A protein has these predicted regions:
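Primarily short, surface-exposed interaction patches in extracytoplasmic proteins
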Residues: 92-128, 132-167, 181-228, 289, ...
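Disordered, acidic Ser/Thr/Pro-rich linker "stalks" and the adjacent N-terminal cap
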Residues: 368-416, 439, 465-530, 631-656
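Exposed low-complexity, polar/acidic, P/S/T/G-rich flexible segments that act as propeptides
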Residues: 433, 446-469, 533-535, 539-543, ...
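Primarily the internal scaffold of c-type cytochrome electron-transfer domains
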Residues: 7-16, 21, 73-87, 194-196, ...
Length: 978
């Protein structure tokens, strides 16, 4: 350990009996006189233990001596001992027992002078169990059928039907995806999107099929290593291809890979073992018997992966693999063939245009040589000297010897430069703006981005005016803007289009640290009178101080339809007999300036992009390298400081490795779910129990180590763990057992007595009452509104969210286009999960960003949550959906019947008289207001464009019902399981 000087530990038996550097055993069982621990405790010199504070009392020393005399036995931490079934405890209230679970919980209650609460009524129970098993409330039809069923097995029939529903896997996958840190993007600042949704679908399908949990584990850890692995088994390994991946500039690919392997080790520890492994990558565990070397033994199982990023010239990286193609349908193949045919046609057209252009090359040479004239003739561009300048921001400017202006001071957020220059003599046909470098600029420039210090600029608009003596300024229209380079999604045309929006601009990422230029022709050339000035206005409206750092202006008497000749090209033109290599350079330069060719090249690029867009979908999978990597312990987790070599292995504090297991991920998966493992079944059962009751039998679901909360019902936890394994690791059988227990079926009503005796419901004296998770709240409202789509699987979906949320997030800023079809109303498990910007309503209800393994979500209560339910576009649509359902399902019903129907759809119970009265008053007051203000209903309904309804519905009634529905969806009871 990092503070341990003599390598002696007394917290674990093997270390105490072994001793430290002195090789003297701290504890010799039965012999206190020879035990170094007693020698140190009784010492009065520098070797006394404890070294600081008061010495042990005589009573404490006597206790220590008796303990050593008795054999110095250490009690092993309960979680590291194999679970065993204990006999079912006897209880007094036998009539309240429905299955073995109740023996354990009721016995604990009776020992405290307590008993179960009364059973929940049928309406509350079916809503609770439906929410727990499928994440959705029952339909009115399901509710009525259950209420009418008086058979003894009525509840069992409901549970069986829910377990067989495909909605079961969709609901329970959510918790596993939190553990798997599943997301549709890389994470970090770049946060590019990536395809891994096939793994999400695999989890849903596996849970619906009740795949035995041991097989579920093995396939995720090492499914690709199973002999003749199926597509499904390979897709399962996506579990460990979901870590974040940093592809930003400055990241070392090997460091990135090592960090991902660290993540795989710690996530495995949390998910299956309930062990906090993060600290062990740097030092041995402070509280549990896991040495740093053992961390790297597990690391070795996952260390045979290839690099998962590829570089772009050292500036940045792309996440790329390994991947596996998904089975494609005929339609995809036809689309790809059509796109490839279109690409070939464009490529032929481009080749023909190149041949035509090359035929005119000699004419171009002659014309350009004539322009240049003899050696030493005047250059094409005349540099203009600035005479006045100012900025709307806080910039100051310094005029340099080359007539450029160097910006200094703070870079304004959205600065507008106004720079006057001398006008050229004679004809003015075009102007040029150069953005030059300087040592004082970030990375030498050419921009002054103050947001993150990189040298980018975003120039939104350039305007030019002629200032003649004694006359008003004359705006000069600019056309045909050309630049030497422009960042993707930005173009030269934006400089002069007058739009002034964020994307209509010129930017130069990632071509930093080099000068750039832009040329613009005048729509009508002018001849300034002597003494005239030119006024250049440079508008930087993007924000963040992304301003030009050192502008210089030039003018020409000729249009700048072709880019200005670089000096190297001009020098070659002046040569009477250029070499073949030099002639090739001239030809290449000429072809680059051909606008027709440029347009065709863009068309070819677009066709190539389209081919890429219809590529066969793929998914991320684990792949083993042919030659295993060498694994070394890394000092303090630093990949640049490797120490001793280690082989794959497992912690000695847990069950031993079997010889028949291969020393790879597949073998490690089998070790995890071996019945001798004391942790996995306990950890998994405890986590599922928490989903039903709100808290695990062990409250620290992520930590079963020595610092964990002790189990409230240890015998129950062990009984469930063994029962789980005995039943073939069946998830559904365990869930059925919990759902049909009297413990689960109690009323959740809280009495003063229960608050006093069991305020946190640790002893399960009442049923669970919990706020729903983020996805459940949305899914619940979709089901209530009648909008829910039951379409399963496939790529992530894009429900509505506030505009522009993704605009400033991630590299290349992928656009968020809200779905307009049924994908808009699909379940939360399918919603796009972007780590840098998760779906906002999920965030508001405590959804994680999934940048790491997340074993348990928090439950907060904030005003923002109520505002989300009232005003979020998705919930507004759902409120209108519910209003339409009420009017269309109950066309001839009276008001109270409609209100009761809406209430039952929402809460699965009949409203009380006072509740009905409140809703009636709300509806009638809103209807009166809407009839008085005739435009309000139309404005409301016209604004909810995604929801279609019959023109036969009265708009005032529909709008009034919208407000009733909006209120029902925002009730605390609606978003609570009780």
């Amino acid at each position: 350990m990092d503070r341990q000087k003599g390598e002696l530990r007394l917290d674990f038996e093997e270390f105490a009996f072994k001793g430290g550097e002195s090789e003297l055993a701290a504890v010799i069982p039965g012999n206190p006189e020879k035990s170094e621990l007693m020698v140190r405790v009784l010492d009065h010199g520098d070797d006394r233990m404890p070294s600081k504070g008061d010495p042990l009392t005589k009573a404490q020393v006597d206790t220590l001596r008796k303990w050593i005399e008795g054999g110095g036995k250490y009690a092993k931490h309960w979680a590291y001992m194999k679970p065993e079934k204990s006999p079912l405890p006897e209880v007094k209230a036998k009539e309240r027992v429905s299955n073995p679970i109740d023996h354990f919980t009721l016995a604990r209650l009776e020992a405290r002078g307590m008993t179960f609460s009364e059973p929940a009524d049928k309406a509350h129970w079916i809503r609770r169990v439906s929410l727990d098993l499928v994440g959705l409330p029952p339909t009115v039809e399901q509710l009525d059928a259950f209420l009418a069923d008086d058979s003894k097995d009525a509840r069992e029939k409901v549970v069986d039907a829910l377990l067989q529903s495909p909605r079961y896997g969709e609901h329970w996958a959510r918790q596993w995806l939190d553990l798997a840190r599943y997301a549709d993007s890389n994470g970090f600042q770049a946060d590019q999107l990536r395809d891994s949704w096939a793994f999400r679908d695999w989890v849903i399908e596996a849970m619906n099929a009740d795949m035995p949990f041991d097989q579920f584990t093995i396939e995720q850890i090492g499914g690709d290593l199973i002999p003749k692995a199926t597509f499904s088994q390979q897709a399962a390994t996506g579990f460990h291809r979901t870590p974040t991946c940093n592809v930003e500039a400055g990241v070392h690919p090997e460091e990135n890979r090592v960090n991902q392997v660290f993540d795989r080790v710690t996530t495995t520890g949390t998910t299956w073992l309930g062990i906090t492994m993060e600290c062990v990558q740097c030092h041995s565990h402070k509280y549990d018997p896991f040495a740093q070397e053992e961390f790297y033994k597990i690391f070795a199982f996952f260390n045979n992966t290839p690099l998962e990023v590829k570089g772009k010239g050292g500036v940045s990286f792309d996440f790329w693999g390994p991947t596996m193609d998904l089975p494609s349908d005929k339609g995809q193949k036809n689309q790809k063939q059509a796109a490839e045919t279109a690409l070939k046609a464009k490529e032929k057209e481009l080749e023909a245009a190149k041949r035509d252009s090359e035929a005119k090359f000699e004419d171009w040479l002659a014309a350009e040589r004539q322009k240049l004239g003899k050696e030493g003739s005047a250059p094409l561009w005349t540099v203009l000297k600035p005479t006045q300048w100012k900025s709307s921001g806080k910039e100051s400017f310094t005029l340099l010897d080359d007539n450029s202006l160097l910006a200094g001071g703070m870079s304004g957020a959205k600065s507008i430069y106004e720079i006057e220059t001398e006008a050229p003599e004679g004809k003015l046909a075009s102007v040029r703006l150069e953005t030059l470098l300087h040592d004082s600029l970030p990375s030498k420039g050419p921009g002054r981005n103050r947001t993150n210090g990189n040298p980018n600029f975003v120039l939104t608009e350039v305007t030019l005016s002629l200032l003649e003596p004694g006359k008003k300024p004359v705006p000069l229209k600019l056309t045909r803007a050309k630049v030497d380079y422009s960042q993707g999604n930005f173009s030269a045309k934006g400089l002069i289009d007058g739009k002034r929006d964020l994307r209509s601009a010129w930017a130069i990422a990632t071509e930093f640290s080099k000068p750039h230029w832009a040329t613009m022709d005048l729509a009508k050339p002018v001849e300034p009178t002597p003494g005239s000035k030119l006024l250049f206005k440079l508008e930087h409206l993007y924000g963040g101080g992304r301003n030009v750092g050192r502008p210089r202006f030039s003018a020409s008497s000729e249009p700048a339809r072709q880019p200005a000749l670089p000096k190297a090209i001009a020098d070659l033109l002046r040569k009477p007999k250029p070499t073949a290599k030099e002639s090739k350079k001239l030809l290449d330069h000429y072809l680059k300036g051909d606008e027709e060719l440029a347009d065709l090249e863009k068309a070819v690029a677009a066709a190539k992009k389209k081919v890429g867009q219809v590529k066969v979908a793929s998914t991320l999978v684990m792949v083993e390298m042919d030659k295993p990597r060498e694994t070394r312990v890394m000092a303090r987790g630093n990949y640049l400081d490797p120490k001793q070599t280690v082989s794959p292995g497992t912690p000695t504090a847990l069950h031993p490795w079997k010889k028949e297991w291969p020393a790879n991920r597949l073998g490690f998966g089998k070790w995890l779910v071996d019945r001798e493992n004391p942790l996995v079944a306990r950890v998994v059962v405890n986590r599922w129990w928490s989903q039903f009751f709100g808290s695990g039998i062990v409250a620290t679901e992520e930590d079963f180590g020595s610092q964990c909360e002790p189990p409230t019902h240890p015998q129950l936890l062990d009984w469930l763990a063994v029962e789980f394994m005995d039943n073939g690791w069946s998830m559904k059988k365990l869930h059925k057992l919990i759902a049909l227990s009297s413990t689960y079926g109690q009323s959740s009503r809280v009495t003063p007595e229960l608050l006093e005796k069991d305020s946190d419901n640790l002893w399960f004296a009442r049923g669970p009452r919990l706020r729903l998770t983020a996805e459940m709240i949305r899914d619940n409202a979709l089901r209530i509104s009648g909008l829910l789509s039951e379409k399963m699987g496939g790529p992530p979906v894009y429900p509505p969210q506030p505009d522009g949320l993704w605009r400033q997030t991630g590299r290349n800023e992928p656009k968020y286009a809200a779905a307009t079809n049924e994908d808009r109303f699909r379940r939360g498990v399918y919603v796009i999960w972007r780590r840098a910007a998760p779906y906002p309503s999920f965030v508001n209800f405590d959804g994680p960003d999934r940048s790491s393994c997340h074993p348990k979500r928090s439950r907060t209560n904030t005003p923002l949550q109520a505002l989300t339910l009232l005003n979020d576009e998705a919930y507004v649509e759902m409120a209108l959906g519910l209003a339409i359902r009420v009017l269309e399902d109950k066309t001839k019903a009276e008001l109270d019947e409609r209100l009761s129907y809406a209430f039952r759809r929402t809460l699965s119970r009949e409203p009380e008289a006072r509740e009905l009265a409140v809703l009636r008053e709300l509806y009638e007051s809103e209807l009166a207001r809407l009839r008085k203000d005739k435009s309000s209903s139309k404005e409301l309904l016209d604004g909810i464009k995604a929801i279609k309804f019959s023109a036969k519905l009265d708009p005032n009634q529909l709008a009034a019902w919208f407000f009733v529905a909006n209120t029902l969806l925002n009730l605390d009871e609606t978003v609570t399981k009780g």
